Every structure is written in structure tokens, then in C-alpha cells.
Regions:
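Phosphate-handling DNA/RNA-contact segment within nucleic-acid enzymes
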Residues: 3, 30, 104-119, 158-298, ...
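Conserved active-site segments centered on acidic
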Residues: 6, 82-137
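C-terminal or mid-to-C-terminal helical accessory/interaction module adjacent to the motor/catalytic core
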Residues: 330-413
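N-terminal structured subdomain of primase-like DNA metabolism proteins
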Residues: 1-103, 165
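Structured, non-catalytic alpha/beta "coupling" segments that mediate domain-domain communication
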Residues: 9, 76-91, 197-217, 345-350, ...
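Terminal peptide-recognition signature
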Residues: 38, 59, 72, 139, ...
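Conserved phosphate/pyrophosphate-binding and hydrolysis machinery centered on Walker-type P-loop NTPases
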Residues: 11-14, 102-113, 129-133, 154-161, ...
Length: 414
């Protein structure tokens, strides 16, 4: 039976994880969490933590990690659907009836995963081959280590419009197009979407390749081509619900207690190359509500670290405006301001990873950033100017849905 991600998310939200785990494991309150000796390995000092707000447990000793469903399958040995049915009964939810169309969609998604996996293997092989000298030179100039290149799965898409079609001949044209690998234009022959680009795989939370991003290698030869090109939305990929590098950054964030949001995937890789592994990026769009919720499942106060130019600061303000209506107790954003004109890679190369760590250690609050951005937006030379500032701040405050947080922001800002 195929259950939708939305239904499963609702089940997790209605389930109090500590109550489920507490039936078979003695839990002790530890701040906002509960702790216990881990049931998955022998230990005397508790390193197993349960977080009801985020809906997961994690052991810092053996790395066991999961939600209520995973607990019932791993700790009690229940089959997946039996675990779901037990939790649904307790939550007062009805398990959806089997849907043949859902099964067909699941089968199609599995087939499309085969397409993206095959494409990724081909891209990586191209980078290592004779045609990969130009992208290899670019990666060398960027200072990416061989280990980073392998870990992040860099590849190369050649300029030939039919190269991928020939290489992935086991898949028909329809599947290649549905996976976002080919472009179909009425009255013309289909052609490869990614050509003469340095390629990066985009993964889902389980680490499966679901889409790609490509950086153009010869922008002067094609001035109209975008510098970066992502896969379109497909049955596998919804860019507004996906964060680049989340499957790698989430374990690192659990260790460090922080999650960093940068503008693009090359920024996330540059941070990882410098040893800062808990960085993610949206995919060509402003940070969405769904992405903010994804971040809050990992940490309570993700750190925005956008470029230190006007575009980067505007992107930060768009993210803040998107987050304000969603604010709730213990959930907010923090903001790091990079030096003017610099992105994370520039700062690391100029001043070293230590300079980046120093900035990340002292981020500004959302409230302070909001005040300073609006304060600098226009001069305050007259009573009218000051009234305009107050009106802009009040508009922001009024968008906050949580009454207590709205009242506190109003008191601080006005």
C-alpha cells in the first residue's frame, strides 16, 4: 500500500513519541527532551534522546535514529504497515484504503529512480573520462578536494544534444522526459536538457538521486544560457519541498546543533570542503514554507548565511518575511552577514575556515535583522520618515500568527 508523505507527516504530528517509547523504555526528562540508556547498544551513561517537538529519537553513541514508525519496526520488530496501523489507531486516524493508481504512481517513481541513478553514473564517468578535462580544471580552480568531488558526485554532461539518449538507451523517450532529463518540443526532435555543464546530483532525504543541477562551463559561448540550470519539477522532485544536501547535513546538524542555509549548492559544497558539513541550500527559489519546516525538524534556529551583496540581503529578507507568520515558541531564524561582496567560498579562501566559524558562532537574531534592514532602507530625516519606518515594522509584526510572539515583537520593535 502506498501512503502519501502528507498522510504520514500528519500521523507523526499526532503521535507523542516519548509516550510510544516510554512504554518499553524508562525515560528521564532532560530540558525539552527525554533521555535514556540506548536500547540498541550496551551503555551505562545515557546517550539516547527523544525529542517530541521534532518527532525523532537519536542515540549519540551508536547513531540509531528514527521516528515513531521506525521505533516500532526496529525495536519491536513490527512490519511497516502494522506499525502504521497501530499508531493510526492511537491517533484516531483512518489508514487510507489501497489505491491502485497510487501503486502505479509508486511503480513509476521507482522506474524514474532507475533513470536518475543511471544518468548519475554516466555523468560521473564522463567527468573521469577524456571529455572531462574542462570541468576537472574548473573543480581544481575552485579548490575542491578529490574526496569532496567524489562525495558530492560531480559529473559532466557533454555538449552533444543526443549524448544522454544514446547512453541511456535502455529507457524510452517518455521516461527520460518524465525524469527531467530530456526536453520535448512540439514539431521538433527531443534533446538533452543538460549540455556542456558540470553536473551535481540532487538527493531526497533518503539519499536517492531525484534531480540534477548543472553549471555552465562556457558562458561566453552562450550568453543567453543560465549559469545554473536545475531539473524541472517531476514525480520525483519538487524544488519547493527539497533542500540540497539535507541527507548529508542532517546527521552533522544533530552532532553540532546547528543547520546553515546558504544560497546555492556550490556554497554548501564549499563549506563542506572546509569542514563545515551542516549546510543546505534551496534550489533556485526563495526559501519556502515547506523548506522552513524541514529546517525546523532538524534545529530550532537555522542560520541563514546568504551572500554579502544586495541580492543576498534581499534573499535573507524574503526568507524572514516568509518565516514571520510561521514563528512559534523556540522556532525562529538566525542570520549571519557576510562581508560586502563575499560569498562563503570567498570568505573561506580569503580568511580561512576560522573566519567563517567566527561569524557562525555569533549570528544576529531575526528581530535584530528585521530592525536593522528596515532602519537602513531609507533616511530618517523627518517625522514622516520615522512614521514610515514604524508602519513597515508594524506590517511585519502583524503578519506573525502566534499571539504571544506577535505581542513580544511589537513591544521590542515599536
Amino acid at each position: 500500500m502506498a501512503l502519501s508523505p502528507q498522510w504520514l507527516d500528519e500521523l507523526r504530528m499526532r503521535t507523542t513519541l516519548s509516550a510510544v517509547i516510554g512504554r518499553t523504555l524508562r525515560l528521564t526528562k532532560a530540558g525539552r527532551e527525554f533521555k535514556a540508556c540506548c536500547p540498541f547498544h550496551n551503555e551505562k551513561t545515557p546517550s539516547f534522546y527523544v525529542n517530541d517537538e521534532k518527532g525523532f529519537y537519536h542515540c549519540f553513541g551508536c547513531e540509531a535514529h528514527g521516528d515513531a514508525i521506525r521505533w516500532l519496526t526496529d525495536q519491536r520488530g513490527l512490519p511497516f504497515m502494522d506499525a502504521v496501523k497501530e499508531l493510526a489507531a492511537e491517533a484516531g486516524m483512518e489508514v487510507p484504503a489501497p489505491d491502485p493508481r497510487a501503486a502505479q504512481r509508486a511503480e513509476k517513481r521507482a522506474s524514474l529512480h532507475d533513470v536518475t541513478a543511471a544518468a548519475q553514473a554516466w555523468f560521473e564517468g564522463n567527468l573521469r573520462g577524456a571529455d572531462g578535462s574542462q570541468p576537472r580544471a574548473y573543480l581544481s580552480r575552485r579548490g575542491f578536494s578529490d574526496a569532496t568531488i567524489r562525495e558530492f558526485g560531480f559529473g559532466y554532461a557533454p555538449g552533444d544534444r543526443q549524448a544522454l539518449k544514446r547512453a541511456l538507451g535502455q529507457f524510452d523517450e517518455t521516461m527520460l522526459s518524465e525524469a527531467g532529463m530530456r526536453i520535448e518540443v512540439e514539431g521538433k526532435d527531443p534533446y538533452d536538457r543538460f549540455r556542456n555543464r558540470l553536473m551535481l546530483p540532487i538527493h531526497d532525504a533518503r539519499g536517492r538521486v531525484i534531480a540534477f543541477g548543472g553549471r555552465i562551463l562556457d558562458s561566453e559561448a552562450n550568453l543567453s544560457a543560465p549559469k545554473y540550470l536545475n531539473s524541472p519539477d517531476t514525480p520525483l522532485f519538487d524544488k519547493g519541498r527539497t533542500l540540497y544536501n539535507l541527507h548529508r547535513a542532517a546527521p552533522a546538524a544533530r552532532q553540532s546543533g546547528r543547520m546553515i542555509v546558504v544560497e546555492g549548492y556550490m556554497d554548501a559544497i564549499a563549506l563542506a570542503n572546509a569542514g563545515i558539513r551542516e549546510a543546505v541550500a534551496p534550489l533556485g527559489t526563495a526559501l519556502t514554507e515547506n523548506q522552513i519546516e524541514l529546517l525546523w525538524r532538524q534545529v530550532e534556529r537555522p542560520i541563514l548565511c546568504f551572500d554579502g551583496d544586495n541580492a543576498g540581503q534581499r534573499a535573507a529578507m524574503r526568507a524572514i518575511a516568509r518565516a514571520l507568520p510561521m514563528l512559534r515558541p523556540a522556532h525562529s531564524l538566525a542570520i549571519v552577514r557576510l562581508p560586502a561582496g563575499m560569498d562563503p567560498d570567498d570568505l573561506i579562501k580569503d580568511k580561512g575556515p576560522e573566519a567563517m566559524e567566527a561569524l557562525l558562532a555569533q549570528p544576529d537574531s531575526l528581530l535584530d535583522t528585521l530592525w536593522e534592514f528596515e532602519r537602513a532602507a531609507s533616511p530618517l530625516n523627518s517625522p514622516e520618515d520615522k512614521a514610515g519606518l514604524k508602519a513597515r515594522l508594524l506590517d511585519h509584526v502583524d503578519s506573525i500568527q502566534h499571539p504571544d510572539i506577535r505581542a513580544l515583537y511589537k513591544r521590542e520593535l515599536l
